[in-house]
Amino acid sequence: PSMGQDNINRGIHSTLWGFAAIAVMMIIYYVTFGAVSVLALGINLLLLVAILSMLQATLTLPGLAAIALALGMAIDANVLINERIREELRNGNTPQASIHAGYDRAFDTILDSNVTTLIAGLALFMFGTGPIKGFAVVHVLGILTSMFSAVLVSRAIVNLIYGYRRKLTKLSIGQIYKA
């Protein structure tokens, strides 16, 4: 039992260190939009843990692996959005138009990747047993919270920061390289 608890503690620490590393990298690379992504990622993690707590789920190593995967998919969605906004800025669009187009145009890609992963998670749940089924439950919930946090939460935060500014001339999204 103590060996299993030790592995779970290490898994929790690994997930937290991974979160911290992602946070630092995102803020350095995307500045304000990186901070928004990190805040949305934190909300994603809190939502996922809250849902698991409401379900009275026991935290296991497969569950921790699914949480780590959910965090990876959530940050990937934010990277897609941020890069799409940068691309729109490079194309000469205004900051407001770039934000709008960035979220809209990244959505299909994010939805496709999450739906295909969700299908795999549902298959694992239907046909798996024991730890595989536990992984699948956390994985499916993580996909749903990731979609919510990456698309809706981050956009709401960006709208809070930039939405009221009508004469916005610049975005704090890191270096925008023109080819």
Q: Can you annotate each of these PLM segments?
A:
Residues 9, 13, 17, 35, ...:
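Alpha-helical transmembrane segments of multi-pass inner-membrane proteins
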Residues 5-60, 126-130:
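Interfacial segments of transmembrane alpha-helices in multi-pass membrane proteins
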Residues 1-15, 167-179:
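Structural signature of multi-pass, alpha-helical inner-membrane proteins
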Residues 26-30, 51-62, 67, 71, ...:
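Hydrophobic alpha-helical bundle architecture
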Residues 26, 41-45, 64-78, 122-125, ...:
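Hydrophobic transmembrane alpha-helices
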Residues 75-78, 82-85, 155:
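Membrane-embedded alpha-helices of multi-pass transport/permease systems
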Residues 87-179:
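Hydrophobic alpha-helical transmembrane segments of membrane transport and translocation systems
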Residues 3, 22, 51, 79, ...:
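Residue-level signature of catalytic and energy-coupling elements of molecular machines
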